[in-house]
Amino acid sequence: KHKYNLQKNIKKFIMRSAILVKSGRQLVVDNVELPKNLRFGQVLVNIKYSGICGSQINEIDATKGPDKYLPHLLGHEGSGIVEETGEGVTRVKKGDHVVLHWRKSSGLEAESAKYKWKGKKVNSGKVTTFSEKSIVSENRLTVIPKNFDLRLATLFGCAIPTGFGVVNNDAQIKIGQSVIIFGIGGVGLNIAQASKMVSANPIIGIDKNKKKLTLGKKFGITHGFLSKTKNLKDK
């Protein structure tokens, strides 16, 4: 088993994390204990920034039904610096700057980390980011240049690839095809940006927030409408 080489200072096995203890309630920020050994395919990352996806809000509110994994850690998009690597890991090394993402990439699929909170197990997925540190599966990490802004890098964990994936992989938009985007948030803006890159036209954005529509035009939206607009189809 690969060690962190931190046994001389047990405090380094403790990190601050946001924990979902009960659905619909505020997250609990508290000390969480990391396991002292990295398992095959796992990577220890020092988290620098984390994004907050709408799906996490839904997860907190249990909009898809009862949460059978409580209590558990959260977050699936972020950036950080690799601290240690487990056995078998070859795609990343100590000191690498990385994006943490929910989609699988190349690399090893590791088991989920086993953390403890108040002496009891706290669950996690293959990647979590609402913590000071995270034990991540190798295939949820992508190395980025060290001079790239880690704050901006979080967008590559979900919003950017999701938006571009919708346009290029799912809808497969072609030159001159029209696009309508409902909701100009992080994903919507990147759908607009990707649509512009493939020369879609028109690119229509619909949102209840006028400021988002204004911002959307910088990303490629050609026509923006408030969702409460009457006779929208005629326009």
List the predicted regions and their residue ranges.
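Cytochrome P450 core scaffold surrounding the K-helix E-X-X-R motif
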Residues: S55-D61
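Nucleotide donor/acceptor-binding cores
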Residues: M15, G41, G176-Q177
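NAD(P)H dinucleotide-binding glycine-rich loop of Rossmann-like/cofactor-binding domains
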Residues: K104-F182
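Glycine-rich beta-strand-centered segment in the early N-terminal region that forms part
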Residues: E33-S50, T63-G107, R140-F148
